[in-house]
Amino acid sequence: MKVISSIQELRDQLRGQNRTAFVPTMGNLHEGHLSLMRLARQHGDPVVASIFVNRLQFGPNEDFDKYPRTLQDDIEKLQQNNVYVLFAPTERDMYPEPQEYRVLPPDDLGGILEGEFRPGFFAGVCTVVTKLMSCVQPRVAVFGKKDYQQLMIVRRMCQQLALPVEIIAAETVRDEDGLALSSRNRYLTTDERKEAPELAKTLQRVRDSVLGGERDLGKLEQQAHTHLAERGWVPDYIAIRRRANLIAPSAAELEAGEPLVVLAAAKLGATRLIDNLEI
């Protein structure tokens, strides 16, 4: 595996490749990330991964400085998973001058849910993903369903900007107790880690209620919010939305069997966790 930091060197290395599969990450790789690499290999060759902790998608009070950086461990894991090139640029490589041009998602998708609680987050994501796509020129790119809203925004962005990249969705990988794998799980204390699976269990109860015929979605959302709060969580949102556009479904759409997803974000101690389940 080649480890490259220079954009020009990356382009030189990939010149002539027309089936590249790309997996962008921020590093601190776990089994969830590695499952993306394996899925990428099913859809293209060679597989290119990137590791870049993107300052643009962190808010002023978020964890950019303490976000775990484990490059040497990550390199070993990628080598074991047959990745052809790791693009690991420095901040100077990616942003040699102030990034004045940004890619802004529409408010109806980028300003809700995560976008409401993390202003500027999706503009940072879209900007860096567009720049990475320009560098790698992949045929396909793999994103995880765990970041459901991000997946939808990136997919729509590629469609609307006519980027010739197929976005592949990868299923969320969970620990044995149901907790969705995340680099931020390492922030949890021992007691918090024991409590953390309750987020997924709460979403499962919401899903089961909807599948069982409950149509008062607002009541389900509030019950889930209250349940987590009573256990010491601080929920940002629990929302049942249409999979197609993350808009709340109408009564008619519910009766017609509109595909739904329940999404949640909540703090447990100092750690903010997100999760979702399709319904």
Curated annotation (Swiss-Prot):
Keyword Cell membrane: no
Catalytic activities: (R)-pantoate + beta-alanine + ATP = (R)-pantothenate + AMP + diphosphate + H(+)
GO MF term set: ATP binding; pantoate-beta-alanine ligase activity
GO terms for cellular component: cytosol
Subunit annotation: Homodimer.
Residues annotated to bind beta-alanine: Q57
Protein role: Catalyzes the condensation of pantoate with beta-alanine in an ATP-dependent reaction via a pantoyl-adenylate intermediate.
Broad class of where this protein is predominantly found: cytoplasm
UniProt: (R)-pantoate binding residues: Q57, Q150
Gene: panC
Family named by the database record: Belongs to the pantothenate synthetase family.
Annotated active site: H33 (proton donor)
Subcellular location: Cytoplasm
Entry's Gene Ontology BP terms: pantothenate biosynthetic process
Organism expressing this protein natively: Burkholderia orbicola (strain MC0-3)
Pathway: Cofactor biosynthesis; (R)-pantothenate biosynthesis; (R)-pantothenate from (R)-pantoate and beta-alanine: step 1/1
Misc. remarks from the entry: The reaction proceeds by a bi uni uni bi ping pong mechanism.
Alphabetical list of HAMAP family matching this protein: PanC
Annotated protein name in UniProt: Pantothenate synthetase
InterPro entries: Cyt_trans-like, Pantoate_ligase, Pantoate_ligase_C, Rossmann-like_a/b/a_fold
Annotated ATP binding sites: 26-33, 144-147, 173, 181-184
Taxonomic lineage from the root: Bacteria, Pseudomonadati, Pseudomonadota, Betaproteobacteria, Burkholderiales
Assigned keywords, A-Z: ATP-binding, Cytoplasm, Ligase, Nucleotide-binding, Pantothenate biosynthesis
Family annotation (Pfam families): Pantoate_ligase (PF02569)
Keyword Ligase: yes
